[in-house]
Amino acid sequence: MTHQTHAYHMVNPSPWPLTGALSALLMTSGLIMWFHYNSMSLLTLGFTTNLLTMYQWWRDVIREGTFQGHHTPIVQKGLRYGMVLFIVSEVFFFAGFFWAFYHSSLAPTPELGGCWPPTGIIPLNPLEVPLLNTSVLLASGVSITWAHHSLMEGNRKHMLQALFITISLGVYFTLLQASEYYETSFTISDGVYGSTFFMATGFHGLHVIIGSTFLIVCFLRQLYYHFTSNHHFGFEAAAWYWHFVDVVWLFLYVSIYWWGS
């Protein structure tokens, strides 16, 4: 590394890919044990090792990029391409759920009663909690943009305030979604409506939790002065992800809650 004559980051050997793979094996095996034998010990072990791996791996990435200066402009360009491709893969992930929903709803089979929602299903009112959830996520999209512009202008105080508001709105959305699930009259096992509804909105809720975690890490990093107006890709990637989550929810609201009800 001392005689490096190029701008690329030659990554040092790391144990985290191996521990990450092992934790994934433990989690998938643990899920099977939980489903079939009602034992959560293997799942808990896998989840714990996965969390530890993520923490230590991203800790190393922060050290390399923030303190050791390995994230040169050309490395950041590669990271940007990687984040864009990751979000594109997520788009296709959710496209599968929308495909399943529209495939079932546009031509409901006789088993469903020939109508949508299927006979016996009482859908949620789209003008109640779902509309509030939409307002909350749209407001969080505004506040994350405010945080980004504040960071670009070097206004640390406003950046922290806007980021805190965004995190609070994300947590509020998650609580609203949980309360909505608690009040539904149908379950994930209630045919194709229940399965598509809970899979699509559930995975979106998981993405909101992941995005909120990203933003909390960015908030803590900003407290320690990790970001500058021209070197803040970690925050930028989290903001892109949050906007993606925001847009997916709009499609979910229009498709499943409003049109689908």
Curated annotation (Swiss-Prot):
It is an enzyme of class 7 (translocase). Gene3D superfamilies: 1.10.287.70, Cytochrome c oxidase, subunit III, four-helix bundle (1.20.120.80). The chain crosses the membrane at residues 16-34, 41-66, 73-105, 129-152, 156-183, 191-223, 233-256. It catalyses: 4 Fe(II)-[cytochrome c] + O2 + 8 H(+)(in) = 4 Fe(III)-[cytochrome c] + 2 H2O + 4 H(+)(out). Its EC number is 7.1.1.9. One of its GO terms (cellular component) is mitochondrial inner membrane. One of its GO terms (molecular function) is cytochrome-c oxidase activity. It is found in: Mitochondrion inner membrane. Residues 1-15, 67-72, 153-155, 224-232 are mitochondrial matrix. Keywords: Membrane, Mitochondrion, Mitochondrion inner membrane, Translocase, Transmembrane, Transmembrane helix. Component of the cytochrome c oxidase, the last enzyme in the mitochondrial electron transport chain which drives oxidative phosphorylation. The respiratory chain contains 3 multisubunit complexes succinate dehydrogenase (complex II, CII), ubiquinol-cytochrome c oxidoreductase (cytochrome b-c1 complex, complex III, CIII) and cytochrome c oxidase (complex IV, CIV), that cooperate to transfer electrons derived from NADH and succinate to molecular oxygen, creating an electrochemical gradient over the inner membrane that drives transmembrane transport and the ATP synthase. Belongs to the cytochrome c oxidase subunit 3 family. Component of the cytochrome c oxidase (complex IV, CIV), a multisubunit enzyme composed of 14 subunits. The complex is composed of a catalytic core of 3 subunits MT-CO1, MT-CO2 and MT-CO3, encoded in the mitochondrial DNA, and 11 supernumerary subunits COX4I, COX5A, COX5B, COX6A, COX6B, COX6C, COX7A, COX7B, COX7C, COX8 and NDUFA4, which are encoded in the nuclear genome. This is Cytochrome c oxidase subunit 3. It comes from Canis lupus (Gray wolf). The gene is MT-CO3.
